[in-house]
Amino acid sequence: MGELTKLISAWEEYTQKNGTASATAFCMYYLAQESNNDLFGGLTPPDIDTTFAKLIGRLANMQTAYSKMALQELPGFELEWFYFLNTIYHLKEVRKTQVIQYNFTEQTTGIDILNKLKNLGYIAERTDPEDKRAKLVSVTKTGEKILFKVYQLLHKPTLLMYNDIDHKDKQVVVNILKDTETKHQEILSTVKQKSIDDLLSETLGEEKMAAIMQEREKMFRHWNAKRLKEK
């Protein structure tokens, strides 16, 4: 397919979906699509939400991979230990259950990590005076020492990934995402036995959720047909 034919086909497809389309709006849309094609090796996700989620997810996976590389300087130290130590350090003295919830960890896995940190002398534990059934944990001097060492190591992946991005651009992204992070921290800490559909219904309402899912099915069918046509 020639470049001009490709552009005309894209314009026709765009105008069918957007009756009052302008050339400027189309150009912005087309450039965004082409950019996403390059980003994901030609297999562009069917909508901007999925593109957004995929990009953030891949960046998170890359950060994890680089972080594990950096921690090779501390043989035996697990990345999950850092998350727990960091949480306890910033929350001061805190209940075990709060640490586990904050890190979205299964109860048994979280208890296992906390026990390892305690056995290594990185955290101390005492009974909560307000609730004898609960345990409070805090970071020890030994824990602080190892935590500050890990801070230095884990700055390397951050530097590698994000140093080239302009500070103002990074601040814009932080401003956009911080409320979402806070909102879902609260949701996940109280989720208990709810399903993802329960959470969607509570957040969007059942009617809106059904309409979105129906539109999503149509979008996916269109996207899949387009993908097969381009093969």
Regions found by a protein language model. Give the residues of each.
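N-terminal leader segment of winged-helix/HTH proteins
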Residues: 1-74
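A structural signal for well-ordered alpha-helices, especially hydrophobic packing surfaces
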Residues: 60, 147, 181-184
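Flexible interhelical turns and helix-capping residues at alpha-helix boundaries
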Residues: 60, 75, 92, 103, ...
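N-terminal helix-turn-helix DNA-binding core of bacterial DNA-binding proteins
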Residues: 68-105, 109
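Charged, amphipathic alpha-helical coiled-coil/dimerization segments
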Residues: 116-171
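Terminal interaction helix/tail motif
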Residues: 152-229
